[in-house]
Amino acid sequence: MPISSALSQRGQFRAMYMGLKAQHRLDRTPVMLCEGDSWFSTPLSMNLLDWIVSPAPGDEERGVPQFGQGGLFFRVERSGDHAAPQGAAPGRAMFAKDNIDDLLGWFTRYDFDAVLLSAGGNDFVDTWLHGALAGSAHLDPAEAFEVIVSTGRYEQVRTAYEMFLRAFHTARPGVPILAHSYDYPRRIGSAAELGLGNLGVAALLKKSEGPWIGPNVEGVIDGGIDAWRAFVRRMIDGFVERVLEPLKRDSSLGGMFDYVDLRGQLTQDTQWNDEMHPTEAGFHQLAGIFRGRLIEKLPATKR
């Protein structure tokens, strides 16, 4: 069983944590709580979090940041989850009160060194995006982005983030919380191809997943793929400027919330598996950036 899969099981985490405690190794081993969406959980390939949990052979020799003493990861991420509560699927919201309360039970029971988040991308695509742009036509990217802004979606997502951050910061004020931006997609309209290599026999029932953006913009935004890329770029910049950055600057969080800006890293179509997910190599590149920032947040004895 892959390390990342094993550590996603709560019982496995508990057993491994207690084992490290019995061996007096917790003072050297960073312990992370991870909640997120498909950038932390997609089975299409090694994802962003997989590469942080299980670095590639040779990474250290190439100068990729490493945890000095390894790490223990409590993983509860799920592909498709939203940040803000959803009326149609309340159980798929990471920052809903029930989920926050559940995770707080673990967060206060074990000595975590950091919280890692991947949240917000799904809140702006798929059926929501279709509804937001319904009735619009012949828009340019700037006009389409203003439609998104007018829905109040950024405020909803920021409020959901804030609810999670305040709950966790109140519970343990000294624990850093690290999120990330998304990179700018290239292959707008491309579905995720599923196969035996990434999904096993489940792929026999479903050959692809998505696309989540292309079908919702192709009849609304004029200009083809270049215009669609420009629109999505504006949405991702808006996520940083209207959600992540204001929360980072919120003094009531004591400077304990931060995010890794991953924008502008993967600039080639070949670095993307589909319109929302990088390839395994793309995620590996982004993970090196994320891991370096995470190490900076850890206690000196655990870096």
Give the ranges of each region predicted by the language model:
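Substrate-gating cap/lid alpha-helix
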Residues: 188-256
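Histidine-centered active-site loop/cap adjacent to the catalytic His
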Residues: 270-303
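Short hydrophobic segments within beta-strands
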Residues: 35-36, 180
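Short N-terminal or domain-adjacent regulatory/targeting segments
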Residues: 1-30
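Short, well-ordered beta-to-alpha junction loops that form the rim of enzyme active sites
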Residues: 120, 179-185, 261-264
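Surface-exposed cleft-lining segments at the edges of enzyme active sites
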Residues: 138-159, 164, 223-232
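Conserved SGNH/GDSL esterase-like catalytic core that processes O-acyl groups on lipids
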Residues: 31-33, 39-150
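Hydrophobic, aromatic-enriched interface-forming segments
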Residues: 153-205
